[in-house]
């Protein structure tokens, strides 16, 4: 009977709907939530003081200047932060709302969530009852790509509209599974930069990603529609935390990668693409002029002004420029030649077969005409009926010589940056005639000649014979006026210092004289031009001899002499000058060879000369990341030991007669196509430490080398590339080690490149994924140093 009495009640309980999940306010007003380890903070923020626009976002928690990595309501800001909330609704969604604006943002999860997690990686995750994610911020990024964030073909990182406006901008980073590459895209449709195809080891256009201590990359299911890509940053050792790093699509359309420097408490730009801002599609807008030589990339030509002054001041140039005196079509309009320029995209045109004067007359009579260009030989006239975008100087064979319609009311309007600069600088030139004479007298004491830009332009035949290009600028071969002596003229790009600072540093460099340093003969510091004139080195740079397919072959005797001479030159910079000079860019391209193949170190002092900070120095090392010491990335202070590391990497290349990083295995010899040899240092380190030095030596030498010198030089190289800068020898000691004055023992294996040899791939295609709650594989150390010591001496200091 009791069972009969309670049975209907039990049935009733089963028939009732489950209790609803109660709504939960997660954040209200100025409240914040910290992630595990307090690395990230979730809360409301405003980009400027006094702004009425507030956003829910994720930022780094402990930094003096807020750095936002994700924004929820980037399209609809809230205006009343005090009543604004982040809430988990009873229906299982995350929403941002307030009393005044209502719901301004909501997650789009397909299944209801019951709770949330805020991970130490900066990922906001909505989970269900069994803890599985139903939505996460990593799948819905804004402009930032964090370590551990899995990028698919459905994921896009879109820039902010401007520095202070988080709303979606014009530029996005996307993974294209069909092309197996990342692309930077303008307005979702126009690609303007790509990484190139995935080779199984790296993207073709980004060889630096193969350096093991910077990232660990994983490409899952490449060449398929479900392809995904993610990365992590391994710690430098077993006790330190991984470096804070992030990729960001800037509002200016460049993809940048930053690392955090705990010493200076600031972000350092480690990498960016495209390097030339003028390659960014439509950066300067209609009738805006783009030049990488300006302090800011975009300018309006005289006679034009920004359409949006406020946006222009905040580095948003997308609205472009307009005529100062209204639209074209007035009787007072006239024409001025722009010169050979190119522009982005297509422009609506009308084609005619008329003379130049008739072409101009036709344009002037058409209210829609912006300008024209005319080909004299064929009388081809093209009338521009739309304003061209992102004007820039023409390069190569693509040239569109445009004549723009300008109004002359109030001023002489000349559209053409090449014409504008002399007009701006006329007043300055009179003042500098007097100072140049004083400069010539002062620098003559240092045997430095002060050149005019016109003199160097003439000496290089209009900068026509380009013999090299480095991070600091292009190098041209020339002949000094009234002489048959060849010189190398380096035209510096993006000068970072004022004229007085530039001349002071030139004075310092000119005072440095050493047989293994390239001699500075003179310079030019005129207007925006910064040029350095060096002795010309007829045998070129060491880099031209480091290819197995090159017909040039250096004997072992020459290689050893180059190594010793380079070491002496660097040691003089570190220890022989009044002020220690850290080169910051030791690599084969900066080791030049005179007619007798003696080594001459070039580009010394340029990092300081151009005001290069961490970001700008590393920006010069595009394609040469194999020489960058770990402390560049870890945030430790940069000392002379950074040059020692780079020198050690260069020694390995000199011994092997090849580059350290080779993405395309076709450039290797037939016997050297093993997968591990795509990155030479870890394999070479293992062979050298285990006593198999002969296997590392350039096979083209056919055994014609001094075994004792090879062993000594190879062992010194491994000492130089130690992870811990404290156990790397000073350059003065390196010289003595190479000379045989200081004996050398077998060094410990470098831990960072050791991880690569152990089989923990940084280059291959991974079949695993890195998900929340499951740590990505750690660095392994599978290479141990032999117990026996070398027969030639004590450990080096």
Swiss-Prot record:
Residues 461-742 form the Protein kinase domain. Residues 24-401 are extracellular. Residues 274-310 form the EGF-like domain. Gene3D superfamilies: Bulb-type lectin domain, Phosphorylase Kinase, domain 1, Transferase(Phosphotransferase) domain 1. Changing residue 490 to E: Impaired serine/threonine-protein kinase activity. Residues 550-566 are annotated as: CaM-binding. It is found in: Cell membrane. Keywords: ATP-binding, Cell membrane, Disulfide bond, EGF-like domain, Glycoprotein, Kinase, Lectin, Membrane, Nucleotide-binding, Phosphoprotein, Receptor, Serine/threonine-protein kinase, Signal, Transferase, Transmembrane, Transmembrane helix. Its main location: membrane. Glycans are attached at residues 30, 49, 150, 197, 366, 397. InterPro entries: Bulb-type_lectin_dom, Bulb-type_lectin_dom_sf, Kinase-like_dom_sf, Pan_app, Prot_kinase_dom, Protein_kinase_ATP_BS, S_locus_glycoprot_dom, Ser/Thr_kinase_AS. Residues 1-23 form the signal peptide. SUPFAM superfamilies: alpha-D-mannose-specific plant lectins (SSF51110), Protein kinase-like (PK-like) (SSF56112). CDD domains: B_lectin (cd00028), STKc_IRAK (cd14066). This is G-type lectin S-receptor-like serine/threonine-protein kinase SD2-2. It comes from Arabidopsis thaliana.
